[in-house]
From Swiss-Prot:
Gene transcribed to yield this protein: pepA
Annotated binding of Mn(2+) 2, by residue: 267, 272, 290, 351
Cofactor: binding details: Binds 2 manganese ions per subunit.
Record flagged with keyword Coiled coil: no
Name under which the protein is recorded: Probable cytosol aminopeptidase
Keyword Cytoplasm: yes
Length: 495
């Protein structure tokens, strides 16, 4: 859909108009203008109780005196000074739902007049677009009967004062790029595991080179990884007939060609049955989402290339499968990682860290400015934080602060977990340098502590998205998180 920012006299708009009204008869500035233009029409509707201003109410007006608009959407927003970001999202969703039912093709929105604490018009517009695009998303590639794609709404105009239009246009640019990145991440993550295997993931990575001439892609197969001594990564893949493949996506657009790159590493378990430590059958189908870390890194790289930010960024998609088979690795096995450290396997379902530890060692060759890994790593993180905040662990205070700031800017929320030396005690093994699990307590933290052993040569952060990467129930599907958070982080780094 086309988004734009313009400033047009209310009396001259001949398409469709969206106005905000609040409880207790309060009107937004443009709603006041409309009331004056229509000789008190809106005031009379409030007086007789037709318009309440309560959140969730959307009233459609037609044939209004002194107004050329086809329709006026009067949107109830609740208490003017108590609107939260969550409520703002709900207001946008309800408004779009109503508009689509009318078959309107063009709308002019004044909802950016809604005031939110510590938010500006840039945020209002950007968040509105991301919400609108999310409401349009559907994944029906494998359905014989496709969803309704016949919406006639093709232009959404934000009415913005001239002095704010440059900022509004920048918000539109950012929002559209991020929304595209989120969509691509969702599409890959929602794809079934009989289609989306490590080779498919690598093919998607290679397609990015066609999207942008700033991107080059290298794919490492099992032969190349064996030559690099990535035996921990390869052990996880032993039970699968599908070859493990690690895709390295290089984006280079920094004015200084020698500038150190930012590296993003995504866990790409295209299906995780748990291996010999087999998972319960209930909801095992959702383990196709164990590659959401890689999918989100793909989405970020897509958004990055669309925005052409002046950065050097490398995205790594660490793809493989963890399945039970006569060739599968076993509890009790001792693996030698690429770093040389040995790991005793106590549970084959704690496989993500075994893949990531070698990927995190591999990226040392790029002499990175910093490294962020993204992974659906632990159920313990879901127990600790639920499904609203991603878990953040970091060895660098400044990096942690920057990521939390990006999370706050985008509402792609994250919460920092501790990382102190005591947690390493839980990872001790009688037979190897490390055990791959740390016992029952603090599982999300001990998983991060395990990875920290392989990140000593650069600033590092870890995002555990096990609780935020997908939804369950009637709204089942990938969320595309944390594409928004990480893209905002990169935008901030480029300034």
């Amino acid at each position: 859909m086309k988004y734009s920012a313009k400033n047009t006299a209310l009396s001259q708009i001949d398409s469709n108009i969206i106005l905000a009204v609040f409880e207790d008869g309060e009107l937004s500035p443009t709603a006041m203008q409309f009331d004056q233009l229509s000789q008190g029409y809106l005031t009379r509707l409030i007086q007789v109780g037709e318009v309440s201003g309560k959140q969730g109410q959307v009233l459609i007006l037609r044939d209004i005196p002194n107004c050329q608009a086809q329709r006026i959407f009067i949107v109830g927003c609740g208490k003017k000074d108590k609107i939260t970001e969550r409520q703002y999202k709900q207001i946008i969703q309800k408004t779009i739902q109503t508009i689509l039912e009318t078959q309107a093709s063009e709308v002019v929105s004044f909802l950016n007049e809604i005031e939110l604490k510590n938010r500006d018009i840039h945020w209002n517009i950007r968040f509105a677009i991301e919400t609108i695009e999310a409401s349009f998303y559907q994944f029906d590639a494998f359905k014989t009967k496709k969803g309704d794609e016949n919406s006639v709404l093709n232009e959404f105009i934000f009415d913005v004062q001239p002095e704010l239009q440059q900022d509004a246009l920048l918000a539109i640019t950012y929002a559209q790029a991020i929304a595209l990145g989120v969509k691509h991440a969702k599409d890959i993550a929602n794809c079934p595991p009989n289609i989306c295997n490590p080779t498919y993931l690598a093919e998607q990575a290679q397609s990015l080179a066609k999207h942008s001439n700033l991107i080059n892609v290298q794919v490492l197969g099992e032969k190349e990884m064996a030559e690099l001594n990535m035996f921990s990564y390869l052990a996880v893949s032993q039970g699968s007939a599908n070859e493990a493949k690690m895709s390295v996506i290089e984006y280079r657009n920094h004015p200084d060609k020698n500038a150190k790159p930012i590296v993003l590493v995504g866990k790409g378990l295209t299906f995780d049955a748990g291996g010999i430590s087999l998972k319960p059958a209930d909801s095992m189908d959702e383990m196709k989402y164990d590659m959401c870390g890689a999918a989100s890194v793909f989405g970020v790289m897509y958004a990055l290339a669309t925005l052409q930010l002046p950065l050097n960024v490398i995205g790594v998609l660490a793809g493989c499968e963890n399945l039970p088979d006569g060739n599968s690795y076993r509890p009790g096995d001792i693996l030698t990682t690429m770093s040389g450290l040995t790991v005793e396997v106590l549970n084959t379902d704690a496989e993500g860290r075994l893949v990531l530890c070698d990927a995190l060692t591999y990226v040392e060759r790029f002499n990175p400015e910093l490294v962020i890994d993204v992974a659906t790593l632990t159920g313990a993180c879901v127990v600790a934080l639920g499904q609203h905040n991603s878990g953040l662990i970091a060895t660098d205070e400044k990096l942690a602060e920057k990521l939390l700031n990006a999370a706050e800017e985008t509402t792609d929320k994250a919460w920092r977990l501790p990382l102190s030396e005591e947690y390493q005690e839980q990872l001790k093994s009688n037979f190897a340098d490390l055990a791959n699990i740390g016992g029952r307590w603090g599982g999300a933290i001990t998983a991060g502590a395990f990875l920290a052993n392989f990140t000593k040569n650069y600033p590092w952060a870890h995002l555990d998205i096990a609780g935020t990467a997908w939804l369950q129930g009637t709204n089942k599907g990938a969320t595309g998180r944390p594409v928004s958070l990480l893209t905002q982080f990169l935008i901030n780094q480029s300034k």
